[in-house]
Curated annotation (Swiss-Prot):
One of its GO terms (molecular function) is dihydroxy-acid dehydratase activity. Binds 1 [2Fe-2S] cluster per subunit. This cluster acts as a Lewis acid cofactor. Belongs to the IlvD/Edd family. Homodimer. The gene is ilvD. The active site is at 517 (proton acceptor). Keywords: 2Fe-2S, Amino-acid biosynthesis, Branched-chain amino acid biosynthesis, Iron, Iron-sulfur, Lyase, Magnesium, Metal-binding. This is Dihydroxy-acid dehydratase. The keyword Metal-binding applies. It catalyses: (2R)-2,3-dihydroxy-3-methylbutanoate = 3-methyl-2-oxobutanoate + H2O; (2R,3R)-2,3-dihydroxy-3-methylpentanoate = (S)-3-methyl-2-oxopentanoate + H2O. It holds the Pfam family ILV_EDD_C. It is an enzyme of class 4 (lyase). Its cofactor is [2Fe-2S] cluster; Mg(2+). The modification N6-carboxylysine is found at residue 124.
Length: 616
């Protein structure tokens, strides 16, 4: 029978000092022996996805206490990728994932907590907490802050849906008036919550459902809706039950590594491909798998991407649907239901509800359930009122979207495409693979060939795009922006956005060893591995080199002879200590980022730390 971890600090005369300090936090004799649950919050006023979380930790804590546990809350940092975008702040985004994972480990292990409720939401916070959960392997439930309502505005006498990406595109479009640009900007992000499309934050929150570590509707129920309160209350109750099952009944099935096992990781990736999730999810799933010592690699992602159809097309891949529409159609469970009926899921998996996948689908799939309370939950809709407060409205759709032919979520028979929303490409420019969000690529661009325009920083690429130096047919190559070379693997949202602003979104390709925002669409290929700073061939590309991209064949090739590449490599190595660094780039890099770069691996490994350098 496993012993409560917290007993280390609450039992025995030698722990009198620790108990004295626990008493100073409000604990009493009756509390010693109860499970101590860490409530891991990520409230901050910097991030709209987290601005409403201040009191939600208390909500969970009160429910934990009422259910027989002891709740202790602490906070992690949270970086807003949208605000950090387009300047030096973006260098800190991906490294913050490791800091979040470490800070959770530090707090939980230092104080011997028995279990966790992780209150996450945005881009690096959910992945960081997920990495920590699998590293620590103690009972955990994720409950996110929820998605933002989609923005809406009236242009040309027509009501249109908006999100952050629309504001960015139109803000840089010289053909859009100042008045229209300002109207879009003011309307794009109307409420608290994670940005309203299938961007990285919402993608990751959806994947926690497929991994079995969060409750149904976690990924899709709006941040503003009153129904979301129940997710927090239920998380507080359920985590005490999970802790007692493990520590008092020796039931290891409730541990995250046994719930989020390889079969669950495959299901999460299948969901991601089917819903055209952010390419960043690949990076984060690979990282989380390594933390959990789960054998899940790029090869698995490549294998799965070849058989999974695209069942749910959401912004930024199209503007008709946002997360509020996914929820109306049944949310993540609705997509999983269609994937299950297509025979694509591993069914022998469990979740924090204590249910198998078939049991969960029977109870929560809107196409199967007879439970009116479940249908009511999925009818939760937007209010269209600007607010930063959670649970502030109770609006309902008049009906659910159960149209699996032409609705938001499709059956396999009526899929948006039989080829899924993400693909892994291989070739000499990315020997270890690279990622493209096929959900956002026009059919006419699936096969593309063009001359390279090479830039060694995002800033130089943006200047060239806005300056008219990039023309239709070009392949923009941005290198030395990987985990080690950036350092920090910046998102290339501004270059892809400005290509659209300049009318080049469908006539150019972009390849980088950096990564993309979940808001990116178009022929945007990221995570090229090995990265330039690790000696990858992307570091040898020259202006004018022809690059051939064939997504159906999963290939990407730099059309340069092997002997010429060998000659270029010798020239690069002759630079000595300067080899595999930018030839002409001025960038201030802090010691914190340099420390990150020393241990960073390329994207095909999830950009995690190189354990071999630490003796691991």
């Amino acid at each position: 029978m496993p012993k409560y971890r917290s007993a280390t600090t609450t039992h025995g005369r030698n722990m009198a000092g620790a108990r004295a300090l626990w008493r100073a936090t409000g604990m009493t004799d009756d509390d010693f022996g109860k499970p101590i649950i860490a409530v891991v919050n990520s409230f901050t006023q910097f991030v709209p996805g987290h601005v409403h979380l201040r009191d939600l930790g208390k909500l969970v804590a009160e429910q934990i206490e009422a259910s027989g546990g002891v709740a202790k809350e602490f906070n992690t940092i949270a970086v807003d990728d949208g605000i950090a975008m387009g300047h030096g702040g973006m260098l800190y985004s991906l490294p913050s994932r490791e800091l979040i994972a470490d800070s959770v480990e530090y707090m939980v292990n230092a104080h011997c907590a028995d279990a966790m409720v992780c209150i996450s939401n945005c881009d690096k916070i959910t992945p960081g907490m997920l990495m920590a959960s699998l590293r620590l392997n103690i009972p955990v439930i994720f409950v996110s802050g929820g998605p933002m309502e989609a923005g809406k505005t009236k242009l040309s006498n027509q009501i249109i849906k908006l999100d952050l990406i629309d504001a960015m595109i139109q803000g840089a479009n010289p053909n859009v008036s100042d008045a229209d640009s300002e109207q879009i900007e003011r309307s794009a992000c109307p409420t608290c919550g994670s940005c309203s499309g299938m961007f990285t934050a919402n993608s990751m929150n959806c994947l926690t459902e497929a991994l079995g570590l969060s409750q149904p509707a976690n990924g899709s129920l709006l941040a503003t809706h009153a129904d979301r309160r129940d997710l927090f209350l239920n998380a507080g109750t359920r985590i005490v039950g999970l802790a007692k099952r493990y520590y008092e009944q020796d039931d290891a099935s409730v541990l995250p590594r046994n719930i989020a096992n390889k079969a669950a990781f495959e299901n999460a990736m299948i969901l991601d491909i089917a819903m055209g999730g952010s390419t960043n999810t690949v990076l984060h799933l690979l990282a989380a798998a390594q933390e959990g010592e789960i054998d899940f690699t790029m090869s698995d992602i490549d294998r799965l991407s070849r058989k999974v159809p695209h069942l749910c097309k959401v912004a930024p891949s199209g503007q008709k649907y946002h997360m509020e529409d996914v929820h109306r159609a049944g949310g993540v469970i609705g997509i999983l239901g269609e994937l299950d009926r297509a025979g694509l899921l591993n069914r022998e998996v469990n979740n924090v509800l204590g249910k198998t996948l078939p049991e969960t689908l029977e109870a929560y799939d809107v196409m199967l359930t007879k439970d009116e309370s479940v249908k009511r939950m999925y009818s939760a809709g937007p209010a269209g009122i600007r607010t930063t407060k959670a649970f502030s409205q109770d609006c309902r759709w008049d009906s659910l979207d159960t149209d699996r032919q032409e609705g938001c979520i499709r059956s396999r028979e009526y899929a948006y495409s039989q080829d899924g929303g993400l693909a892994v490409l291989y070739g000499n420019i990315a020997v270890d693979g690279c990622i493209v969000k096929t959900a956002g690529v026009d059919k006419e661009s699936l096969i593309f060939r063009g001359p390279a325009k090479v830039y060694e920083s995002q800033d130089d690429a943006v200047e060239a795009i806005l300056g008219g130096k990039v023309v239709a047919g070009d392949v923009v190559v941005i290198r030395y922006e990987g985990p080690k070379g950036g350092p920090g693997m910046q998102e290339m949202l501004y270059p892809t956005t400005y290509l659209k602003s300049m009318g080049l979104g469908k006539s150019c390709a972009l390849i980088t060893d950096g990564r993309f925002s979940g808001g990116t669409s178009g022929l945007s290929i990221g995570h090229a591995s090995p990265e330039a700073a690790s000696g990858g061939i992307i570091g040898l590309v020259q202006d004018g080199d022809m690059i051939a991209i064939d997504i159906p064949s999963r290939s990407i090739v730099l059309d340069v002879a092997e002997n010429e590449l060998a000659s270029r490599r010798e020239t690069e190595l002759a630079r000595g200590d300067a080899a595999w660094t930018p030839h002409n780039r001025e960038r201030q890099v802090s010691f914190a980022l340099r420390a990150y770069a020393i241990l960073a691996t390329s994207a095909d490994k999830g950009a995690v730390r190189d354990k071999s350098k630490l003796g691991g």
